[in-house]
């Protein structure tokens, strides 16, 4: 499916008053809080003509979660953008914060990519607080009971902007976020602790990791690098559920070039701690929408593993709270 919009029966988004859009919904959600995703009708009231709130798209893949209850995974006090995008001609900041600082992720909720030509990036979905309510808020429950949970008619949620250019939370990440200067990043460390994203000890370890790898990179260079000019391919034909062991660091280094890449894919310092451990394959990563550009990219012999997440602790002061899954070349893995 490669349509410009995805439609569903009952409300035209352009006919809905924008009262809630301008209303600052403040829930101050913390990790572990129980929330309910508002009805499709309520959420539609917050969206502009592009289907966004503060430039963050509400995607058609999110409709299935309306009315359901979840726990907050993280308050996204700060986040990072894919470094591969910034490696081009772009000079945007690597560490960013969402407009209005009111975004959370929910446990187990990831984008299926079903309405974006089956993108397999499996991003953790970002939720504005205006799209949620606290599960124990009696007044909100009463109000929500009067709202339609049926899918809005003519609710046009864009999936592409032009042929070959997709429209989603990842493609619009830069527009939905702001540069985060170092002074504010220090404050964000305290915000992350207050939001229960991380413990004080956990934050101290993150800051130590950042200082260590920043010094290492300045003095020595790439943290994990090989010596190959042309890097090899490994084919395991892995499928979801397969049990694998991540190879040792020396074995992985033997597949990399001097920039720490295997056929263009970077093996980062954040992946080092997982070497030697066993995990199950979550999904293949053959097709994914590139951060910032909206273009569909294609990988070969690459998978994502269950619960193996990037926290950017080695590169971003204070880390990242978007819980991205890491990419793994099959040549870095051993099937059990």
Which residues fall in each region the model found?
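Basic/aromatic-rich interaction segments and small domains that mediate binding to polyanionic partners
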Residues: 2-26, 31, 41-153, 157, ...
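Generic structural signal for buried aliphatic residues
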Residues: 35-36, 104, 244
